[in-house]
Amino acid sequence: MPKNKTVHENCDILVVGGGMAGTGATFEARHWGRDLKIICVEKANIDRSGAVAQGLYAINCYMGMRWNENQPEDHVRYARNDLMGLVREDLGYDMARHVDSTVHMFDEWGLPMMKDKKTGRYQREGKWQIMIHGESYKPIVAEAAKKSADKIYNRIMITHLLMDENKENRVGGAVGFNMRTGDYHVFRAKTVIVAAGGASHIFKPRAVGEGMGRTWYAPWSNGSAYALPIAAGAKMTQMENRIVLCRFKDGYGPVGAYFLHLKTYTQNANGENYEKKWYDQTKELV
């Protein structure tokens, strides 16, 4: 039986995770660091990995600043109300002011976007979302990452960040193993960007059997984005927030298409539109 190898790599920027965040970070790193050696490491395959692996029917945030539809301040206000004040407004503002240019980039790269034939604007699903034909969403962004990175490592599960032996509280790389061969990989880097997955299925989902792997969010998001920096001593923020998504019988996908695009409503076992029935009482509670 062959002995597992230890593979060493040195680079300027190491991106941990090859989902939408990781592939985007790889592209952005190349934009600002033309001469840097950039490596992206993904536990699956970047073509179909992360929460957007199978595609989406919508981009869930687009300001529309070029048409004066929304401004970053509007999104900060929305987030503040939605999270009852438990929000880093500076982070929300930064995300909101950059999101439009990112969407325009997707459009340029060939992502099929639904547009109003008269105005040319992106078709809205609600106040923030825009509609797309998103089966190719992830492969398109993965292609940009492939062109940007010096190397892409697929099937490598990063387990720990390495601390710099010369500088206190500084990360100097990461280690992991190949999930197919068992080979051990050691990455030394001047900068490490952790863009791994969040944590899904913390609570047991209602979906069982075959439906277990079809729930939203991605079942393979095991909290690496939190565990890796926490183990290295990083200060975390916004960890007091979590999202618990309500779903319907036999429906595993996002509900935005039902309510916002198709203008449907929900009813209880008695056939009643319960949201409308209890709307006034619910407002009093809130």
Model-predicted segments: where are they?
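Generic start-of-chain signal for non-secretory N-termini
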Residues: M1-D12, M20
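Conserved N-terminal/central alpha/beta ligand/cofactor-binding core
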Residues: N4-K5, L36-K37, E42-G172, N178, ...
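Short, well-ordered coil/turn residues at beta-beta hairpins
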Residues: G17, A189, A195-A196
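N-terminal Rossmann-like FAD-binding beta1-loop-alpha1 element of flavoenzymes
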Residues: I13-C40
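Glycine-rich loop(s) and the adjacent beta-strand/alpha-helix scaffold that form part
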Residues: V194-G253
